[in-house]
């Protein structure tokens, strides 16, 4: 190598070393800033706080760090150095939990939902702007239960996700979230018999598996046709049915008692007449407060058969002691056609339930803590309590007031929606009482 070549390469080598040191220092500084940002205590002060799990807190303060709530109290001084969010005259409540949603935040029609998460789905912003921070998502436009014309089948392809838009980290909460069954309305007794037979086979399999494990022997092979039934009997997640009438409700209760699994009823329209039985069996219900399944021109005989206006059903279940979660009329987000009847108006559906006799407290619980309990994630979500995830909303008014807007939405302690910086609802003036 000539001296001229060496002389040319020396500046290049020095430049490379300088640039490497610069980028390493920049990356280190960025990591430090991110770490400091994540670990900083944040506080909302001066708000009317609705914890859901307890009474309203006036002039309340909510503090959190590293994505977890530290304290919720009245007139609590924010820790020194905390990042303050002034909420004087505003409301704070937990993020809404949609107990069932279709296709939001995912790009998959089947298979593993965790591998098909889409944090850049534009519908996430719309949902966040309307207060939803968590939902159970199913990929297909079908929610299992009775009332289908196809064969007996079921599945567990569902997941609980958070709407961390643009951020895959922390998005997946739980997968699978539920089991669900389709039991056709035709030949109901035959399918009931088949269902019981498969549960018997699953129970026998579990007994053989337990015996093999006790002897440290090879476990028996599990048939693919029994996997779902075994999962139901293991009861690691609830199982959901959609009964079309009270006869089918009784079938579900019978199976649940006999085999010891936790059942959930999706839209049991007439079951308000046997709501006390559901409450005694600790069976949660998912109900709509709006819908076309009621004819206001009907008279006595139809009412005697159990017809009740959808707006009154949630309150009827609550009065009996049932755990109620509110469903929107549509389980996706519509960007065209008839608006105001989908996930974007979940809080309005809760307000309709109040019109039908529910208290404000129960209605808010029906879109926060109750869905979290049904999905078995209430140890983290659904209320503002010490140690739970900092998923919360700052609103211009009471969350069930149709005039209220979400001003900020936090998930895992991070700000994911800011009305002032978003195109969603920013141009609409705030009105009404704060």
Briefly describe each language-model feature range:
Residues 12-24:
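Bacterial N-terminal signal peptides
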Residues 34-40, 49, 53-93:
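Histidine-rich, glycine-flanked metal-binding segment
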Residues 128-263:
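Polyanionic/metal-chelating signatures
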Residues 113, 213-310, 325, 373-375, ...:
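Active-site core of metal-dependent hydrolases
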Residues 110, 238, 279, 288-291, ...:
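His/Asp/Glu-enriched, well-ordered alpha-helical/loop segment
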Residues 2-14:
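Bacterial N-terminal signal peptides that target proteins for export
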Residues 50, 385-429:
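C-terminal cap of metal-dependent C-N hydrolases
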């Amino acid at each position: 190598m000539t001296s001229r070549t060496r002389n040319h390469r020396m500046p290049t080598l020095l430049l490379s070393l300088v640039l490497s040191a610069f980028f390493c220092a920049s990356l280190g500084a960025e990591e430090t800033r991110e770490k400091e940002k994540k670990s900083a205590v944040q506080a909302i002060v001066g708000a009317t706080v609705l914890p859901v799990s307890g009474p309203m807190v006036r002039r309340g303060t909510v503090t959190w760090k590293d994505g977890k709530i530290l304290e919720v109290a009245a007139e609590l001084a924010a820790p020194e150095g905390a990042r303050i969010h002034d909420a004087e005259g505003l409301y704070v409540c937990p993020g809404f939990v949609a107990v069932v949603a279709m296709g939001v935040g995912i790009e998959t029609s089947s298979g593993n939902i965790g591998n098909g998460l889409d944090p850049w789905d534009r519908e996430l912003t719309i949902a966040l702007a309307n207060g939803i921070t968590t939902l159970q998502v199913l990929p297909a436009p079908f929610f299992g239960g009775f009332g289908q014309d196809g064969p007996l089948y079921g599945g567990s392809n569902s997941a609980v996700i958070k709407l961390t838009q643009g951020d895959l980290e922390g998005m997946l909460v739980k997968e699978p979230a539920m089991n669900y069954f389709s039991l056709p309305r035709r030949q109901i007794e035959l399918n009931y018999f088949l269902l019981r037979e498969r549960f018997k086979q699953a129970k026998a399999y579990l007994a053989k598996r337990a015996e093999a494990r006790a002897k440290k022997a090879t476990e028996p092979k599990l048939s693919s046709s029994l996997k779902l039934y075994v999962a139901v009997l293991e009861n690691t997640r609830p199982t959901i049915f959609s009964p079309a009438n009270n006869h089918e409700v009784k079938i579900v209760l019978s199976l649940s008692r006999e085999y010891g699994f936790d059942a959930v009823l999706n839209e049991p329209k007439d079951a308000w007449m046997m709501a006390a039985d559901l409450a005694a069996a600790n069976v949660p219900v998912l109900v709509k407060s709006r819908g076309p399944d009621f004819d206001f021109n009907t008279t006595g005989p139809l009412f005697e058969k159990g017809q009740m206006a959808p707006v009154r059903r949630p309150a009827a279940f609550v009065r009996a002691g049932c755990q109620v979660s509110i469903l929107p009329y549509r389980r996706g987000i519509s960007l065209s056609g008839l608006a105001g009847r989908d996930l974007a108006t979940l809080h309005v559906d809760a307000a309709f339930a109040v019109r039908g006799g529910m208290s404000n407290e129960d209605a808010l619980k029906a879109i926060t803590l109750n869905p979290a309990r049904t999905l078995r994630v209430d140890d983290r979500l659904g209320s503002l309590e010490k140690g739970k995830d900092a998923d919360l909303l700052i609103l211009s008014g009471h969350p069930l007031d149709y005039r209220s807007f979400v001003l900020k939405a936090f998930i895992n302690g991070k700000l994911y929606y800011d009305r002032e910086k978003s195109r969603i609802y920013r141009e609409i003036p705030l009105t009404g009482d704060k």
